[in-house]
């Protein structure tokens, strides 16, 4: 069967109504080519430090992208058939071309999803492909992409510049020595790649590597991390080290948004229980909650912006986790409370405008009931954009609809791509800019905004707000 043409409609994601679409076109034209601010994500800094060629289409576009391979897994495709690394570091012996063929044969599974929007953008605009991916074009795609990746124009730094990325933030463990960021800074290359401090491995007593990570934390900092005061000093030391390597933010991926405000004596007793490995689930939750409040206090001193990504049941598929480890598509959103959960932290620091806490959610029911009213009141609180399971166009639209009344536009922070999939970054930002242009065009058409106001908001959402919120 002859493969169909791959094309990107210039009006994709813009309103169907002709009058509103015309407004959206004008708004989008003002933001389409703005530089990309990528203030939170999970790209590998080694790419930019070494500037080595990407290996092939499979290693770049399939293996790191759990948005994609989780969909294939849901249809019974074994992750070994795709060459996904296992928890022990080994991999099935799979020809990357064969893995790509499996992907291509099942590409229809992504129809209508944001992954298809992003990937088709990558195929069309980055690799200049003009036929759709399917079983019949799998080898053509694999050969074309893999050959392109070996050319100078597709080296990581060249793509960074081609994508018009002004700054990108990676995310590292407190145990990371940040040698790649140091190498980038020493290289003379002008691309700006900063890090972010994500202390989860030494904050979550239920993390499978917590005990070993805590030991490394002490060895790295020279602090006695088996005492509460020494543990906090170790965090301050590592935060300063990260800031010296460009960090402007921290990130916290907790099961809930719980915070606490224990006395030093209570915190020490709890910490003693944690380091003995004797913490109950409730004590582990209380410990994470207390550390969040301590991180907020540290942010008042060092100026790092806090990000909180709560409400995900990580590694829901125990068998998959045991075989393949974390970040393999088995993370599931949960109901999440914010009004009660954040109150201890907000009671202590919420009225201090020096604190900047950006809160995300996977529970859309909390947008208008809890998060928008909180962000519309506390000077320390900002709303992160539609995240993960909700960064589809529909999810972005719902976010705007449900937060605008109470939080406005200016208690939000623009867009985060939050991705490991480097080549999809322009596509993700383009989708966000189109959706915001469409949303603003509706407000103009309803005479709720003048078009010049909508233009200013569109530019703010695409560029100014993320720079401001993340101190970039």
UniProtKB/Swiss-Prot annotation:
Its EC number is 5.3.1.12. InterPro entries: Metal_Hydrolase, Uronate_isomerase. Keywords: Isomerase. The keyword Isomerase applies. It catalyses: D-glucuronate = D-fructuronate; aldehydo-D-galacturonate = keto-D-tagaturonate. GO terms for biological process: D-galacturonate catabolic process; D-glucuronate catabolic process. Pfam families: UxaC. One of its GO terms (molecular function) is glucuronate isomerase activity. Pathway: Carbohydrate metabolism; pentose and glucuronate interconversion. Belongs to the metallo-dependent hydrolases superfamily. Uronate isomerase family. This is Uronate isomerase. The gene is uxaC.
């Amino acid at each position: 069967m002859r493969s169909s043409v791959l094309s990107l409609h210039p009006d994709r994601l813009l309103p169907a109504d002709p009058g509103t679409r015309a407004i959206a076109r004008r708004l989008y034209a003002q933001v389409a080519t703005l530089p990309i601010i990528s203030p939170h994500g999970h790209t590998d800094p080694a790419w930019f430090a070494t500037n080595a060629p990407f290996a092939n289409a499979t290693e770049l576009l399939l293996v790191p992208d759990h948005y994609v391979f989780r969909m294939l897994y849901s249809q019974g495709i074994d992750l070994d058939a795709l060459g996904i690394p296992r928890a022990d570091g080994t991999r099935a012996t799979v020809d990357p071309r064969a893995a790509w063929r499996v992907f291509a044969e099942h590409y229809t599974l992504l129809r209508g999803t944001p992954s298809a929007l992003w990937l088709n953008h990558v195929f069309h605009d980055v690799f200049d492909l003009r036929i759709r991916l399917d079983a019949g074009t799998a080898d053509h795609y694999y050969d074309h992409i893999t050959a392109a990746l070996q050319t100078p124009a597709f080296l990581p730094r060249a793509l960074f510049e081609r994508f018009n990325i002004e700054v990108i933030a990676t995310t590292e463990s407190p145990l990371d020595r940040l040698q790649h960021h140091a190498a980038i800074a020493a290289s003379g290359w002008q691309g700006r790649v900063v890090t972010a401090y994500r202390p989860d491995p030494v904050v979550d007593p239920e993390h499978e590597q917590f005990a070993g990570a805590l030991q490394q934390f002490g060895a790295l900092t020279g602090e006695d991390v088996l005492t509460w005061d020494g543990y906090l000093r170790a965090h301050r030391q590592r935060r300063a080290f990260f800031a010296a390597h460009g960090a402007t933010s921290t990130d916290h991926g907790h099961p809930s948004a719980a915070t606490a405000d224990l006395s030093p004596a209570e915190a020490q007793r709890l910490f003693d229980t944690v380091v003995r490995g004797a913490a109950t689930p409730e004590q582990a939750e209380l410990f994470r909650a207390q550390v969040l409040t301590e991180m907020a206090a540290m942010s008042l001193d060092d100026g790092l912006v806090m990000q909180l990504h709560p409400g995900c049941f990580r590694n829901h598929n125990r068998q998959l986790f045991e075989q393949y480890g974390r970040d393999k598509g088995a993370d599931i959103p949960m109901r999440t409370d914010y009004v009660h959960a954040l109150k201890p932290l907000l009671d202590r620091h919420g009225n201090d405008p020096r604190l900047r806490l950006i809160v995300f959610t996977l529970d859309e029911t909390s947008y208008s009931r809890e998060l928008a009213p909180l962000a519309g009141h506390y000077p320390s609180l900002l709303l992160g954009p539609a995240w993960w399971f909700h960064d589809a166009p529909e999810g972005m639209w719902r976010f705007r609809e449900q937060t605008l009344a109470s939080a406005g536009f200016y208690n939000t922070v623009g867009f985060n791509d939050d991705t490991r999939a480097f080549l999809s970054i322009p596509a993700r930002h383009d989708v966000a800019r189109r959706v915001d242009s469409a949303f603003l065009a509706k407000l103009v058409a309803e005479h709720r905004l003048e078009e010049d106001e909508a233009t200013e908001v569109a530019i703010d959402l695409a560029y100014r707000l993320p720079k401001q919120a993340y101190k970039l």
